[in-house]
Amino acid sequence: MRELAWVLPTVAGEIAHWRSCAAAIPDCRLRADASANLHSSRLNAEGAALFAVLPRRRHSALVRGLVAYQTALDYLDTLSEHPCREQQVNGVQLHRALAEALQPSGRLSDYYRFHPWRDDGGYLPALVEAARAGCATLPAYERVRELGIASARRMRVQALNHAPLPERRDAALRAWAAHEFRGRDELAWFEWTAASCSSLSTFVLLALAADPQVQEDDVLEAEAVYFPWVCAASTLLDAFVDQRSDREEGNHSYVEHYDSPAEMVDRLCEIVYRSVHGARQLRNGERHALIATGMVSMYLSKASARSPELLPATRRIAQVAGSLPRVQLPIMRTMRAVQRLGDA
């Protein structure tokens, strides 16, 4: 855990920088979205920056790039939720930013082309350029670039999540998964789309690229563990702990596609186990395991995970993740409490 002693202060500085940028956004609605995301998604940024512990040497530019990318992702997800005439087209256009953030150069798209509000004062392009700048410092970036861009393009599936009619949404997601993962039966269609929504496979590739000695086999083996297993675990656990709020707000919940609560818990346990076990088998496996279990602990540390209806499942999931969550969960709960106190 000593690695967090330098990562977290760097994250705090980056978040403060982006908060000042968000506060200067001319359009009041975009300004509210950007500011609210930086307030509510701080743990997401800290989780992204945790990937900076993978390289043996400290790489501050990697942290800055990871935070910028995660901040852009959270902001885009919120923008995609706003109803508009071309909602799916709008979401796909907005999410172009994720792939372009991983391209070393090139003209940026008009991300707000189909969005009802446009004047962000350069906020989203600045996030994209900050992520690009982080990539440019990585000595082995060319070895991971194509896989990273492919991961970013998969994340466009998030645009389908916000379709106003559940029947059309589910049909679109099912068709997308059938096309993208034809012949692969490790996961159900909704588990594939859940995995594709996650940025964790992108983050591990960026972290590996910080090592000038990284080999192609190391990259491919890590990619195979993070996508689909770690990515699926991340999105599904997020849905697991947010079940009640998603129902109340009418949001799409991936875990509602399971046939029963028992099946949901069984599958979550299996996917979490595959994530953590696979991470341990990688080169520098202890650090990958720290990240995989840290992700599990981040979600299970949420207060809703300890509600009477979820607590038995929470305990079972934490158990299959091994011994590290016993240390990580109290730390994550404390971090959440400190954040709430700071916001009071």
Residue ranges and their predicted role:
Residues 8, 14-48, 62-63, 93-244, ...:
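All-alpha helical catalytic cores of prenyl diphosphate-utilizing isoprenoid enzymes
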Residues 48-60:
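Post-signal peptide N-terminal segment of secreted/secretory-pathway proteins
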Residues 72-83, 234-245:
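Acidic (Asp/Glu-rich) catalytic motifs at the cytosolic membrane interface
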Residues 80-92:
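Short, glycine/acidic-rich hinge or "gate" loops at secondary-structure transitions
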Residues 243-258, 314:
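Active/binding-pocket-proximal capping segment
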Residues 252-277, 291-302:
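C-terminal, helix-dominated tail/subdomain
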Residues 282-294:
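Transmembrane helix-loop-helix
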Residues 294-344:
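Acidic, carboxylate-rich catalytic segments that either coordinate divalent cations
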